[in-house]
């Protein structure tokens, strides 16, 4: 349903944000 799709997108966004944050900390 719509709820599961929203959850899936939320997880994807969180992963992307986490990756970019890790990159910034490495610099």
Curated annotation (Swiss-Prot):
GO terms for cellular component: extracellular region. Expressed by the venom gland. GO terms for biological process: defense response to bacterium. It is found in: Secreted. One of its GO terms (molecular function) is toxin activity. The keyword Translocase does not apply. This is Cupiennin-3b. It comes from the Eukaryota. Belongs to the cationic peptide 04 (cupiennin) family. 03 subfamily. The modification Glutamic acid 1-amide is found at residue 27. Its main location: secreted. Keywords: Amidation, Secreted, Toxin. Pfam families: Cu.
